[in-house]
Amino acid sequence: ARVPAALSRPSLALSILGMPGLTAWAGMVQQAKVREGDVVVIPAAVGGVGAMAAQLCKRAGAKTIAITSGSEKRRIATEVLGYDHCIDRIDEDLAEALAKIAPDGVSVYFDLVGDPTLTTVAQQLSIGGRVVLCGLIKDYNGDHKTTGPHPGLWITKRATVTGLVVYDYESQRSAFEEEFVPIAEAGELVANEDIHDGLAAAPDAFCDLMRGRNHGKAVVRVGD
């Protein structure tokens, strides 16, 4: 990754100011146009994309709901990244939890995982809700592929559903960096990184990532 000249912490060019950050900005700012009063649900909530997405939404005045699993990830979501609420996808019933936290429905869903989470959250959308389809983590390690909600659900919800490929926003990277590098340098953005030391640690870091064991953006540190 190219490291912006004004950046004092190079690893940020791999996380909140790199492709994950650009992806979050493209999805939440450019496509969903998150605004004050929105209720935004983000799965894979403490990963590189989710962490930046949450902070962008909070800066816009939205209410943020994390979906993750495990006590440590729940702690990071609320105490480090500032999510308003966190739902444990393993220990809680997602539909019931969403109905309780967001009784008027979900305004924006940033889909990073695919089904069954996609369908469950879609059923909780408010009328006119926005969905940004960006990732399919659930499809990475299995033969079953995400099918998603029936099209009739999108119609009933009057939903706006867009697909996000971050490379379409590469031409806007400079504008993104110009805005957010100073904000990061001022300490106003949190970079949640899961750092592994040494190139020999790379295989384990990758396996942890694929198994959902990482607690942030996976970074392998090979030198100073």
Predicted regions and their residues:
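Glycine-rich phosphate/adenylate-binding loop and adjacent beta-alpha elements
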Residues: 1-7, 18-19
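Short helix-loop-beta connector
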Residues: 8-11, 33-39, 103-106
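Mid-domain Rossmann-like dinucleotide-binding core that forms the NAD(H)/NADP(H) cofactor-binding site
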Residues: 14-92
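Short acidic-hydrophobic, aromatic-tinged amphipathic segments that line or gate anion-handling sites
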Residues: 85-90, 194-201
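Short amphipathic alpha-helix with an adjacent loop that forms part of the alpha/beta core around
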Residues: 93-104
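Periplasmic-binding protein-like
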Residues: 107-112
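Glycine-rich phosphate-binding loop and adjacent beta-alpha segment
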Residues: 116-189, 195, 222-224
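C-terminal capping/lid region of NAD(P)-dependent oxidoreductase domains
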Residues: 188-195, 203-224
